[in-house]
Each structure stands twice: as structure tokens, then as C-alpha cells.
Amino acid sequence: MLFRIPTLFTLFLACFSLVSGVFGYSPMFGSNTIELNSKNFRKFVKAKGPSLVVFYAPWCGYCKKLVPTYQKLASNLHSLLPVTAVDCDADQNRAVCSQYQVQGFPTIKLVYPSSKGSSLSSTDYNGDRSYKSLQKFVSDSIPSKVKILTSEAKTQKFIQDAQNSSKVILISQKMKPTLLYKSLSNEFSSLPFSFMPAKANVNDLFNISAYVDTSDLPILFIKHPNNGTSFFSNSLNRDSIVEFLQSSIKDNNFSEYLATFCSKKSCIITIQDKDSDSGIDESIRKKYPKLHFVRLGRNTTVAERLEDTLDLGYSDTFLLSLKKSHYNAKPYGKPLRRWLEDIQVQQAGPSVSLPNDLLSKIK
């Protein structure tokens, strides 16, 4: 049952309204739910991908009843996709609530970038408001880039397509990919992801039977452009899989690594002696979650190519932004924390344009 929207919105403005472009937590649904508004809604979904959205009003009784379930959903799913909320009682949000034809509270939708053009698409949720039903809706409805390999022809096509890219393959006793696997394919969209039900019986096309027991499922592995294969040997959770993707691709093709992990986030790349034990302070990583930190061994081929291609001087650390096509080298001897603070307030000096052929030079 929906609480019907009054003809006129109340004049009371939510005291936790967000500044356009700044994403904060929801005052109603808690710290794992992101509060959006008319100004930043489209930009957020275009940048972050498929997002669960609840359109609500603070005074709505049914919305209040939804809070514990939605908080649990956000707690369990926020690492897989954004869980968000829009306060339709705020005047500033009339446009987005009208655009998505919100006629009652709470209205729940999965919103995602359209495959055609720059618009957004959405799928309505019409089930009960139990955790199990909502979780199933997200898992079933989320679009993904996973190719389902159920025949020899589909598998051969997947192998032949994008021959210069590392390919991620999961062979499973299940018949369809999990929400975790789908979300990873969206997050790392430059990598081809595939899913093979064991019943399809076409895994021999990847020539892996000499390396693993193909009856011991699930099997997650990466086929690299150089015909090398990396096998995953941990539990199938997000952090372990991401670490596997990063380390495997970094070791095989650093330019592909940058294109995959430094295209959406800026990267902080540090070049150190191989036996150095001075890593990145964990508190710095937590303070700058939008940065991706990379460590390279000094005198390695990749490090030497980067030093030859970029004008780093005596610097051993630099910020690389493929999206903006520039880099900024940390002054020699300056503490990393202070340098990052300088960047944050635009006091780190001018950035330098990246060479157009950077990725081809550091393969």
C-alpha cells in the first residue's frame, strides 16, 4: 500500500538538503544510504552506474516502516551498488520526483544509464517491502555486462572479441551470475566478464583442465592477451576478487591496469625500492577513498618507462588522472599527507598534460 502524495508539497524544506554535486548520507535511512536531489541525481547515476532509489517523504508512515529494512539492505549492498534516497517533500526535488512519475510513498526503483544515448532508464519495484523481496529485485533487475556462455559458438565469439583485453571468466554450478559478479562487471566495465554454467560443458575451449580440476567449482580465472592465465584461489567475496583482478592485470599488462583501475578514479603512483617497507599509511587511504593507490618497484621496466615518459624529476610519487589527461608530481621530500592536502585546496602547483601515447609506451 502506498501513502498518496498531497496535491501541494509542503513548504517545509529538509534541513539536510545537499549541495549540488556533493553526496551525503540520508537523514532518514542512515549512513549507508546516499541522499540525492534534482540537481545531482542524473550526474550521480551516470557516474556510479545502476543505483537503487527510494523516493520518500519524511512524514510518510509507510516510509518510516521501511527504514529498518532499507537500512539493512544498504548495509549489505552498498559495496555492490549505490543505495540512495530522494526526499520528494523538499521543493528542490519536485523535478526529479515528477520525472520518475512518483505518485505515492515510498516508491522504489532501480535507475541506471541507458544503453542508448545519455538518458537514464529505470525499473519499478512492485513487490512487498521485505528484505528478501527487495534483495531479489536488485539481483534480478540490475543490468550488467556479463556475457553468458551456454554454447560453443558463444564461447568462441567471446574468446575472439576484444583480443587485446584480459577476460574474466567464472565457471559455476549455478545457472546465472550473482549480484556480486554483475556489479563487478559494471564497476570494471573495460574488462570483458563472462559466466559459464557448468552444464554448458564448454570450459575445454579455455584450455584450463591441465591446471585445475574442472569439477571443483566455482572456478574464477583471467585469460590475458599474451595467452597467460591467472587463477583465483580465495573465497568469492568482493575485496578478494578486486585484489585478484588488480594484482593479476598489474603483473601482466600495466597499461591495461591503468585503463581499468585509473580511468574512473585518479591514481597515486609511488615508485619505491622493491625491499622498502614504507607503504601507504592506511589512514591516508581511508581519508581519500576516491583515490586509487599503486606501488611500483624501482628499476622495474614499467617504473623506468614511466620515469622516461613523464617529467618526474626527483619525485617518487605522482597523481595520475587519465580522465582529465594530466599528472602532478609530489615535490621531493614533501610528506605525502601534506601534498594531498595541498592538492585538495589547489595549492600543489600546475598539473602537466599526459602524452597521448602514454598507455602504449608502458605496456
UniProtKB/Swiss-Prot annotation:
It is found in: Mitochondrion. It comes from the Eukaryota. Pfam families: Thioredoxin. InterPro entries: Thioredoxin-like_sf, Thioredoxin_CS, Thioredoxin_domain. Residues 32-141 form the Thioredoxin domain. The keyword Cytoplasm does not apply. Residues 1-24 form a transit peptide. The keyword Chaperone does not apply. One of its GO terms (biological process) is protein folding in endoplasmic reticulum. One of its GO terms (molecular function) is protein-disulfide reductase activity. One of its GO terms (cellular component) is mitochondrion. Its main location: mitochondrion. This is Thioredoxin domain-containing protein C13F5.05, mitochondrial.
